[in-house]
Amino acid sequence: MSILKIHAREIFDSRGNPTVEVDLFTSKGLFRAAVPSGASTGIYEALELRDNDKTRYMGKGVSKAVEHINKTIAPALVSKKLNVTEQEKIDKLMIEMDGTENKSKFGANAILGVSLAVCKAGAVEKGVPLYRHIADLAGNSEVILPVPAFNVINGGSHAGNKLAMQEFMILPVGAANFREAMRIGAEVYHNLKNVIKEKYGKDATNVGDEGGFAPNILENKEGLELLKTAIGKAGYTDKVVIGMDVAASEFFRSGKYDLDFKSPDDPSRYISPDQLADLYKSFIKDYPVVSIEDPFDQDDWGAWQKFTASAGIQVVGDDLTVTNPKRIAKAVNEKSCNCLLLKVNQIGSVTESLQACKLAQANGWGVMVSHRSGETEDTFIADLVVGLCTGQIKTGAPCRSERLAKYNQLLRIEEELGSKAKFAGRNFRNPLAK
């Protein structure tokens, strides 16, 4: 069934900033998709087109991206009468029309909005759930429910505290199914709230952009200690492990790292990549840390390689790889990390996201699907993670509706699959392993 009409508009993300929403119409109905937006963005990401008109939304309007859809992309796609199930053809057409390496003409936010809506329409056209359509597009015969990685303590660019490292996550790998993983996550979260309240006072339990707590602590180890305590109080020491997103590019300073980067600058306190690696190794030794994302700057390739070779845990590339097949190929070649963070808006189309995922999986990497800090109520990534069988997703704490929207969709998918539902559990790094 071909596209009858496409209409884009400006809506608001979870931070009150404008973002792109796309309505796509076929004879089967209306299909709507909204595009997320990141705060700590890698310099190699596809371009998110903003208006830069300082008199409107502090320059963050997306009316240009919306106009590119309504005036250029929509007429082209409608006139070509392509079937909505032809995801790759439609994505390629938009990418060719844009003609730039990083989608800077139309904006990745314009192309992605249409791409997501096409994917949703394609599923209905085929009469299958969205996760099944995505599995088909990726060539997967089975589907898998992921382990959720709940970001329960926020620091870095996501929070107004002193904490340098951006996310401290809990992964309920010992759960029997996704529903139990949600219950464990929620119970640990509420225990953590009480632990923080007792130690730092009630105002320390205000939440950050992704629903995690942002107590005013400086020591990253204290974040891990709080998690360990909360996991123990909830009674899940044997079922929950810890993940971190350091987002080290945010505090990389001329070859070194500043773990107090939110204070006035003082080069005497900077530490070397080796010192930072030793700090991570002490965390791994003292706490159940099984995954560290962006431990070093996006161009500090040597430090990545050295750490991945010796750490013995999952090392996730986000700013390093930016869901870009060229960066992933380089990281595979240099053995820089062993897991890809998959963010659809870093690359800007469904087809390229699938290619990035397949490339990582083909090289023995894990893949973690991810939200952005500026989110919407759109639940596409919940179906994406199931269809791609990546086994792990991070989409915030069990708090704030734009985060829960994804987790709740995963609950529905598990329920729909019934006895056929398979949960990644402790195999979250390689859930397809037989």
Curated annotation (Swiss-Prot):
Annotated active site: E210, K343
Record PTM N6-acetyllysine, positions in chain: 5, 60, 64, 71, 89, 92, 126, 193, 199, 202, 228, 233, 256, 281, 285, 335, 343, 406, 420
Gene3D superfamilies per UniProt: Enolase-like C-terminal domain, Enolase-like, N-terminal domain
Stretches the record annotates as Required for interaction with PLG: 405-434
Record-listed Phosphoserine modification sites: S27, S254, S263, S272, S291
Residues bearing the modification N6-succinyllysine: K60, K89, K228, K420
PTM comment: ISGylated. Lysine 2-hydroxyisobutyrylation (Khib) by p300/EP300 activates the phosphopyruvate hydratase activity.
Protein name from the UniProt record: Alpha-enolase
Organism listed in the record: Homo sapiens (Human)
